[in-house]
Amino acid sequence: MFKFKASDLPEILTRWSARYSVFVPSGSPDNAQMRIWSRRTRKEVRFMEPDEYTNLIVAPKGFVFGEREELFRWEGNEKTCTAISAPSSSSLQEEDKILFGLRPCDTYGLAYMDRFFLGEHHDINYHLRRQHVFIVAVNCLEAGPECYCASMGTGPFAEITAHTEYGMQAGKGYDLLLTPDYGPDHKKGEKGENDWYWVEAGSDRGKALLSHVAPLLYRDLEFTGRRRKKALQEDALKTFRRTLDTSTVRQVLAAHFKGEEWDAIASSCIACTGCTRVC
């Protein structure tokens, strides 16, 4: 298994930025947002280390899903309606981009969107954006106060399951997966001499990303990496303050499917799509 020194992470991001648009978490612990990283902006962007934030304040859905966009046009009258243009991706000009620092819960969500929008209900615009997005996820060593991903099987570590269209072995949705392994002298937000990242490729695209930074990688025994990762995951599971019993979720939701609370929520809807944008 490969690993690299935490102190080399800025250089890795910079090397990637020579080929891709690289987005990294920036801001404050309670307001982490994606900002672009490059040799030019490196000193302007306050890059947040993975132990400085729990998750982004807004999900990264906007990188693959347009807030508003034209799907088709039609013409007609009271009796007939005829489509005069089909969905087209010709108007979307996308460039390859890397989203660094996504958490396992969001990568699982991305994999679910892949399964839907790239499956039977194929969405051309989603497809175009998705094929240009590379995901570098980072496992969580500590749960946030409101986190319950362990109960849902979507964290704190991403696991390898089924394949998606882009070769990702994902119920996870990542191309690369990093696991922080901090030394005993580690200080939050800093890079100590004994701080490392274990790195695993989840797709051929992920392997290509690694090839661009090969001189900065160290190879360790697969057994050593797996054993260390398992220990870190067990420690992370102990940090959860919330749990959720999912055994009866289906029955509870079905029983309240026509509940009055949904009517109350619907009455305030102004069709801004904000809820689906951030979820």
Question: Where are the regions a protein language model picked out?
Answer:
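Iron-sulfur-associated redox domains of electron-transfer enzymes in respiratory
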Residues: M1-V252
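Long, contiguous internal "core" modules enriched in hydrophobic/ aromatic residues
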Residues: L253-D263
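Cysteine-centered iron-sulfur cluster-binding motifs in ferredoxin-type domains/subunits
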Residues: W262-V278
